[in-house]
């Protein structure tokens, strides 16, 4: 097992120096889902939520969150993102909304934190917009599906 990179020899937190690393094309894909009552999913599907277009607003929130990740995660590097895509699947059989975020950059460090942040904030936005009708929603399964680029994960 490798050591934690965000701590120095004295155990103090620090931002990893990526200055000498080459800029490469990097991609990360993350997913998660929010489980809800079937009636809540029906409201999202029909577009009749009182606060507006739930998935449209959640998509924008996810994109904004990816761009602000370094403001939220203390030791995360600010990155110039070249692409952020946030997509949703409505899963009637399990009464949930699945979110998938794909983030890309050309830089010295990966974008998995940005992809994870996009998914989390998009799902939080779904929760916020639907909590008036369903306070029992649960987010789960947030994880990185794919990471490409850099020396440990060559680009496709």
Swiss-Prot record:
Gene3D superfamilies named in the record:
Molybdopterin cofactor biosynthesis C (MoaC) domain
Pathway connected to this protein: Cofactor biosynthesis; molybdopterin biosynthesis
Name the Gene Ontology molecular function terms of this record.
cyclic pyranopterin monophosphate synthase activity
- Taken from the record, one Pfam family name reads MoaC
InterPro entries linked to this entry? MoaC (IPR023045), MoaC_bact/euk (IPR047594), MoaC_sf (IPR036522), MoCo_biosynth_MoaA/MoaC (IPR050105), Mopterin_CF_biosynth-C_dom (IPR002820)
Q: What does this protein do?
A: Catalyzes the conversion of (8S)-3',8-cyclo-7,8-dihydroguanosine 5'-triphosphate to cyclic pyranopterin monophosphate (cPMP).
Catalytic activity as recorded in UniProt:
(8S)-3',8-cyclo-7,8-dihydroguanosine 5'-triphosphate = cyclic pyranopterin phosphate + diphosphate
Q: Does the keyword Mitochondrion apply?
A: no
Among PANTHER family, the record links this protein to: CYCLIC PYRANOPTERIN MONOPHOSPHATE SYNTHASE, MOLYBDOPTERIN COFACTOR SYNTHESIS PROTEIN A
Give the annotated active site. 128
Q: Does the keyword RNA-binding apply?
A: no
Question: Binding positions for substrate?
Answer: 75-77, 113-114
> Could you tell me the Gene Ontology terms of the biological process aspect for this record?
Mo-molybdopterin cofactor biosynthetic process
Q: Which family does it belong to?
A: Belongs to the MoaC family.
Name the record gives this protein:
Cyclic pyranopterin monophosphate synthase
The gene coding this protein: moaC
Tell me the SUPFAM superfamilies matching this sequence: Molybdenum cofactor biosynthesis protein C, MoaC (SSF55040)
* The protein's assembly and partners: Homohexamer; trimer of dimers.
EC numbers: 4.6.1.17
Can you name the source organism? Delftia acidovorans (strain DSM 14801 / SPH-1)
């Amino acid at each position: 097992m490798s050591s934690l990179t965000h701590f120095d020899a004295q155990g103090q937190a620090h931002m990893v120096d990526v200055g000498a690393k080459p800029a490469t094309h990097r991609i990360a894909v993350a997913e998660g889902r929010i489980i809800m009552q079937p009636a809540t999913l029906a409201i999202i599907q029909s577009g009749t939520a009182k606060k507006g277009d739930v998935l449209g607003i959640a998509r924008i929130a996810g994109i904004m969150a990816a761009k602000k990740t370094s403001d939220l995660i203390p030791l995360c590097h600010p990155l110039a993102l070249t692409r952020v895509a946030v997509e949703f699947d409505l899963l009637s059989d399990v009464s949930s909304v699945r979110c998938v975020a794909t983030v890309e950059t050309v830089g010295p460090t990966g974008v998995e934190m940005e992809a994870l942040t996009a998914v989390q904030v998009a799902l939080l936005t779904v929760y916020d917009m639907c909590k008036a009708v369903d306070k029992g929603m649960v987010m789960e399964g947030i994880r990185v599906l794919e990471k490409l680029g850099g020396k440990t994960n060559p680009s496709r």
